[in-house]
Amino acid sequence: MTKDSPTPLGGGRASPKKPSSPGPAAAVLEEQRRELEKLRAELEGERARGRSERRRFATQTRQLRESAEQERQQLADHLRSKWEARRLRELRQLQEEVQREREAEIRQLLRWKEAEMRQLQQLLHQERDVVLRQARELQRQLAQELVNRGYCSRSGASEASAAQCRCRLQEVLALLRWETDGEQAARIRHLQAALDVERQLFLKYILEHFRWQPALPGPADPQATHSLEEPPLEAQSNTGGTPKPARRLGSLESLNTGVRVHSPNDLLPTRAGSLESLATAHSCSLDNTLNCSQASESEVRAPATSASIPDTSSPQPPPQLPSIHRKPNDLQKESSENKPCEASTSSPPGLDYQELVRQNSELAEALQVLVRRCCDLREENLHLRRKGFSEEAGEKVKWLKVKHAELTDLAQRLEDRARKLQETNLRAMSAPVPGESLEGLDLSQVFTCQRAQDLSEQAGALQAKDLQIEALRRECHLLQARIAADLGSSSHPEEGATCAQWCNISDLDRLQRESQREVLRLQRQLTLHQSKAGAWADAGRPSTPSEITRHQVQALERELGLQRRECEELSVQAAAAERRYEETEAQLQAALHKGARLSEENARLQALANWMKKMADENSNVSRQQSHTRQRQELEATSLLAEQLLQQEGYAQDRRQQLQHYKNKALSDLRTSGKEMQGLQFQPGHPSETSETTQASESQARDSGRPTFKTKSEERVLPLPTRDIQPPACLSQQENPVIVEEPAAGPQVSDRNSTSQSLDSKPQAKKTSSQSNSSSEVESMWATVPSCLSLDMDTASEVDDLEPDSMSTPLEMRSLEAPIIPKLKLFLARSSYNPFEGPSEHCQGKLPLTAGDYVYVFGDMDEDGFYEGELVNGQRGLVPSNLVEPISGSPILNHLFLKSPDIGPTALPAGHSKVLKKGSLLLGEVQERGLCQVGRVDSKTDMAAESLKTKTEACWLGLKSSLEEQSFSRPLLEAKGAFCLAPMELQLQNVTATSATITWASGSNRYPHVVYLDDEEHILTPSGVNHYTFQGLHPGTCYRVRVGVQLPRDLLQVLWETTSSTLTFDTPLAGPPDPPLDVLVEHHASPGVLVVSWLPVTIDSAGSSNGVQVTGYAVYVDGFKVTEVADATAGNTLLEFSQLQVPLSCQKVSVRTMSLYGESLDSVPAQIPEDFFSCCPFLGAPPFNYTDGNPFPVCHQKLVQASLGAKSSPRGPGNCGEPQAKFLEAFPEEHPRKHLSLSSLSSDGTNSQAQGPTEAWKGYEKDLSFQKSPQNHKPPLLFGQSGVEEGHAPHICISGSPAPGFVHLSSEIGHGKIRCWEKPGLEKALLQNQYAPMVPPHQQGSSQCQPADFHHVFEEKEALCLDSQGTEKPEQRKNKSQNGQRQGTPGSKRECSVLCPAPTNKVIKMTSGSPDQLETDANNPVRVFLALFDHSPLVISVNSEAAEEELAFQKGQLLRVWGSLDLHGFYHGECNGHLGKIPGHLVVEVEVGTQQTDGRWHLPAQGHLLSETQREDLEGLTNSQGSYMPQGNSRTPTLWTPKTMVAALDYDPRDGRAGVQAKGKLVLRAGDVVTVYGPVDDKGFYYGEYGGHRGLVPAHLLDDLPVHGE
């Protein structure tokens, strides 16, 4: 075969067609059917994607609708707020405008009032001036008339002139009275009364002295004369008695003063009218009497005889009565008119001249008395005017009257306006506004109506009286006219007529007086009725006019204030009503605007919905078109593929023929070479093996006569794109041929894909291999090597490969099967794993694990029990199946394939995991076996590194380059970074009433996560942290937790589908507190006393656990309470033998937490030491007890097969060789493990120094004794049973109840004897048990024996040194305290050390400390770490703030570290004099037990080498803080270490079949992994934990978790 003849399909050697193989047509049809199925599957996938797109569009539509609704709501709220602000602003403006208008209106009204007042004052001044001028004129006229009073006595005077004179006098008196009334209203009434009295006296005097008879011809009658003479005497007596009129005047004045009116504004106009009418009536009567008197006087003065007045009176009607406002000009005209009448009147003759002179003189005296009286009255008036009644007071009274009238008018106008406003408001408002009352308005209206009614009644009464007075006045006029007519009708009447005339005159006088009295009485009653409220307290002292005026002013002011307040209230009510009307109108307008806006928004949303619907239709159309196009393309590709297959089939036929030709040629060549070899056999010196080789070649050639070829269906299993693009998969390229060397040439190993060597060479290769692998590993390595043709070999090599090719057909068929899409599963690492610490020498391809890490697993487990997996940080490699557990029901099983489409086409061929697993061997064997060429045709050749640096980087960086070159797809990390950023597997764990813990699987380990609680940012966790615990929650509350990825700014622009996950949970109600942990029962120094210790529950600052207050702890023994401790922080108590109920049968001790709401559940029970009841009270020193129950499943058959029953002698250091050998034979695949080393104790009481770690290790490697300890039995060697020499101090015996799988080790060093327990060396069982979930330790001390670690045993560096007297030396106590601190777990909450020196010293020392104190203690040991990589936090870290706290270091640098890892995965340490944080995944701890080989220090824990310089630095670091002490294992199991079991059946305690008591039981499904604590109780239940919940589980439903490989 030549180089230019490639194989048709690659992957298998071509061979002639078998007779039983199907025809090409059937193969083509089968291929087409498969293609159609594939197309159908793709079509279904496209449909599924279309449905997902539709759902996505529906989700976007809903989001848009929700966002539109939110925007609309925000816009509505914004507009509402703007509208309210605008409404308030407009309302304020309207209020200000109304207030300004009111103020302007009030100012305008005041200006109008002031103008009106000024006008009224001007009018009043004008009227006053006119009245004063008239009064002065009348006074002047009266004086002139009085001076000329003698005109009646003249001879030429007539009766008419006398009457005219009397009329003028009457008018002057009337005008004088009204002048006084104009000046002072009170003085007018006084003068009127006085004038009335004088007028009456004057009239009486006239009537009495002028009753003459008409003149008769006969002589005068003496009786008449006597009668005429008597009146003068009476007149003299009357006129001369001036005191009588004075007294009358005083009485009338006092009467007038007593009835003075207090409210002149109401009664003054009416009174003025009535007084005017009275004055008019009196003036008429006075004029008549004066006329008669003047006539009689003229008759008397006449020289003729006296004649009667009726005879001499003229028949003319009486003259017109003068009016009050008659001017002086009118009086002069009247006087001029009356003069002719007087002249024409003739005096009656017959009277005696002397008599007439005497009468005239008497009349003149009477007139003088009257004149004097008038002068006195005038003087008195002037005196009173000067005394108190000034013009200013009168003007003030008048101004107050006018002001009152104006205010009354204003009040009436305001009432009208208020009534109009109220009517308007009632029309505008349908209902009154609550809180406002109309009481003030109603009271104002009632007050106004009542006042108007009173005024109307008063005015009506006064008008009625005025009408009565007017009627009486008319009667008086009629009577006077009638009298005057009767007197002038006949000049000579008879005596009877005269008597009737005088009788009528007397009746008239009587009627007039009665009418005057009636008027005065009515005025007095009205005045008293109006002035009841203002009556003076002192009735005897009359009120002065000034006080009356002041009281009137005060009353007016009070009334004015009331009216002002009423006006203000009405104004406020009117403004409020107007404001309510405006608000209502504004609300109406706002509602209209809002309705319009909502309609517009609705229209917009409707348009948007229509647009979205249209877009969805268009999208569906486009999707259909795309699907049709894709189907058409697929059909075209299928037809093209069919054509290619037909062509390839023809080519395959040609190839078969060519191969047959090559085969025949090879056979001929083989025969020729056989002949040549036979010829060479007979040559001397040729080895005998040549014949055997020739025979083997001939047999191979004969067997190769039946060549086998894979069928077409098997060849077409490869993916179509791979077959179309890639050439035949042969790792030996034509350009770079590889010559396979002879097996005897050396230990080099050819390519894994090459099968040119025969099967017989495989054992030879295994023999020549220098590696110490087990047979199963080697067989699995060779079984997974895929075969491939090398087209550029010579003919001899092809002939040699014929038979192996036929035998490797099953391998080829398996290697060329269809690459199924790898099944991705999510696993959880149960415990930590470091491949460098294991027995395997090829650990470069294995992944280091940390407990709690998530591992993505591809495919199924291989035959060696390894998975192909990848960590979240991108590292890939092999994962032991016994260290991880699958997460059932994980959504990530299908989530990653949906999110990353590039994972689908990538296939892992069969055995590829082995290529990765065994590829790690190439890195370790590259210097011994040579170069290995691994990769695809189109990839570059990957050369194995020759240095340790290359191997280290390949191990820690996940062999990325090797994975890429070995056809492994790397889309997982990129897919997670691009598609799966949201945290997955968000789960809830450890939910209490006040706290909860969440965990998640990081979608991307490169970015930090933000934890939200109820949609509020709670905390920012750094990258790599996948759990968080909430504290301070409220019991019985629903919380919503969301965990999201915080992306950098450059990635925020990318449209991620989701970057967060949400979880909702409810905290339980504040229930019973949590039970205590780590209950331990130990011996006390006193016999018969037990020490029960526990770890107190975690309480908050308020002293509560699970939401309730903790009060103490109760100790139960087999379910019976024996004692209580009333302390929430107590950690131990003493239990005496007498307190046990049934001492010999008591086994379990449990502790409960007490609270006010009851007790908690039982803690994990602790076993009472079995030797407690059989222990003698006189023992020298009670032993330390530690019970370590670790029931992990082990291979008990192999343990039984081992002969471990030999007993060890007290001092035989070499008696453990044979049992150890037998034990190791039972487990051939295991490697020697390190053992627990304890320093020897001083036997003679002297100070004994502890052995160093190297010496102790060497010593214990030599002195080991194994003893089989069956379960539930005491150890064969107890304290006191071994030979103890006399004189030696008692030893400290560390013993306990043995557990299955433990081997009792007993060794003696010097005189000290130490027993310890070590677990058997079964690796898989050890790994499974170590990484099972278990309770973290909380109690470590000298009283316990640290259990052996599974990879390196925790070595104890200090010994307890006690002298013979039981005392402890200071330096030993110091060393022991430091050792206890180093052994204490950083996360532990309590450290207990029990000192048991001598039997007489019964001392128990308990030390406790918080985690903070342990971590921050200055005595914490210093740990030394080695940097594996360069670290620059400012360049690598995403968070710049966190980068400032990290330390920068270089690869190979030694770092000093204090404490353990924090929650974020960082150490606290020192580098180059700087303190800060150190990432835990970039450093490795340097153990003290390093060994020096060839000038380099080797670290057995990690496989790194240290140079001498680094070794010196290490010694300097450790010596600076004292001798270095390694830290103990942080995962040391406590009492009843949890056991992992699997549920065989479904179990739901809530249904009726499982029983009624469902509380406190777990719900399980078949296959669930349950962590069990403690043994089975008396009811057949385990106490276990599953999914973060704890409860009881039936024991018959659980099975032990099987061990792989058993």
UniProtKB/Swiss-Prot annotation:
InterPro entries: FN3_dom (IPR003961), FN3_sf (IPR036116), Ig-like_fold (IPR013783), RIMBP1/2/3 (IPR040325), SH3-like_dom_sf (IPR036028), SH3_domain (IPR001452). The modification Phosphoserine is found at S263, S274. Residues 750-761, 1377-1386 have a biased composition (Polar residues). Specifically expressed in testis, where it localizes to postmeiotic germ cells (at protein level). SMART domains: FN3, SH3. CDD domains: FN3. Its main location: cytoplasm. Keywords: Coiled coil, Cytoplasm, Cytoskeleton, Differentiation, Phosphoprotein, Repeat, SH3 domain, Spermatogenesis. Disruption phenotype: Males are almost completely infertile, but otherwise have no visible phenotype. Sperm morphology is highly abnormal with deformed nuclei, detached acrosomes and an expanded perinuclear space. Defects are first apparent from the round spermatid stage and are associated with abnormal development of the manchette. Residues 24-146, 352-431, 461-649 form a coiled coil. Residues 17-27, 688-699, 769-780 have a biased composition (Low complexity). PROSITE patterns: FN3, SH3. Belongs to the RIMBP family. Component of the manchette, a microtubule-based structure which plays a key role in sperm head morphogenesis during late stages of sperm development. Important for male fertility. This is RIMS-binding protein 3. It comes from Mus musculus.
